[in-house]
A protein has these predicted regions:
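Buried hydrophobic residues that stabilize the cores of well-folded domains
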Residues: 1-170
Length: 170
């Protein structure tokens, strides 16, 4: 991927068909004294289900101390018959700018079960959050919608994302 200001290079790594790592290198434009910047997203699976992602925190995310941010995922009981990707992985840097990767097969094999929740690895006494993914199904158990809501330790919650899922099987 290249723009006028920079060139981005990606390397995707897979284990048994599952995406386990994305490496991004951002090269400055030719003649610039800027350094090459690199980011790595790591994904871990257990029995075909995504259990965690680890990514670099970005400078504007002071809550993570500019280190790594690990998010843990929970698989539900619904089998992922329609091979849907975990939608919120697309919001994890460096994939956050490349959502088309979800459907281009670059994310590798989908999880065995639909993901039902995620949360940061290190909740504190003063701040906790848990994001839940609620799927609606038609009479044939085909997912037709996804509601994402985040609940915070202070008792507040927010539903911030509703997605309609449209699946055509040919």
């Amino acid at each position: 991927y290249a723009s006028l200001d920079q060139k981005r290079q990606y390397t995707f790594s897979y284990t048994e068909g599952y995406l386990t790592q994305v490496n991004e290198k951002i090269m400055p434009r030719e003649g610039s004294s800027d350094a090459v910047v690199a980011h790595t997203l790591s994904l871990q699976y257990d029995k075909g289900d995504l259990i965690s992602t680890t990514s670099p925190s970005l400078p504007n995310e002071s809550s993570t101390g500019y280190g790594e941010l690990q998010t843990n995922y929970e698989a539900g009981e619904d089998i992922n018959y329609y091979r849907l990707p975990c939608m919120l992985v697309a919001d994890t840097y460096p994939l956050s700018f490349h959502r088309e990767a979800l459907f281009a097969g670059m994310l590798g094999k989908p999880t065995q079960h639909l993901t039902t929740a995620s949360c940061p690895n290190e909740p504190s006494d003063t701040y906790t959050e848990r994001t839940e993914y609620t799927y609606s199904f038609d009479k044939n158990k085909k997912p037709v919608s996804l509601k994402v809501s985040t609940k915070y330790g202070n008792g507040k919650s927010i539903s911030y994302l509703n997605r309609t899922i449209s699946i055509t099987i040919e």
